[in-house]
Amino acid sequence: MPVRKKPRNDQNGRDPWHHERALYGAGYARVAGVDEAGRGPLAGPVVAAAVILPPYRRFSAIRDSKLVPAAERETLYRQIRKHALAIGIAACPARVIDRVNILEATRLAMARAVARLKPPPDAVLVDGWRLPALQVDQWPIVDGDRDSVSIAAASLVAKVIRDAIMRRLERLYPGYGFANHKGYGTREHLACIARLGVTPAHRCSFEPVRQALQGKLDLAPEVSGEEN
């Protein structure tokens, strides 16, 4: 019988596999992590990813996408794509966000991402909250992208995919700087909205965009920032 090495802890002393380890020990066969990217921006979709990593394989560099520089995210994304047992991706565009609200759009994208996993999981670790649409055992974890390697992997995939979408939107709507600010409410972005107007990629239910449509956009505050 092979000897299993002691799990490697992260810089905070935690075993990044401890949630997954508990579920595999309880008899689950395929444990997925699911997370999203893009809840806060004024433009672009909210993107969700679900990932099933091979049990107990070391992924020491995988961590919350917000803590990873852009160049390293791409490297880790390729590593995840190469080794993951399954990856599911889904997105809800601005028009859906405006119709159902950002919380429900996020839940919808996350549930769809899980549904696209082949083979399907029998347990899901969810960043933040329960997903009512899931027909599988699930465990919501607050700050899960910092506490579960599977959720962290999902956060990286979602972030890389969303950034690629924002680069495509930059080509579709030149001059807005989508490739730079990723749709977040930076002063640069607000100035572009004031100068060029609102595009179909913008979330009209978000207050700064609604203000722009009413001709009342305040350029002073920076609504939200995000890592590059």
Q: What positions do the PLM features span?
A:
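RNase H-like, Mg2+-dependent phosphodiesterase core
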Residues: M1-N228
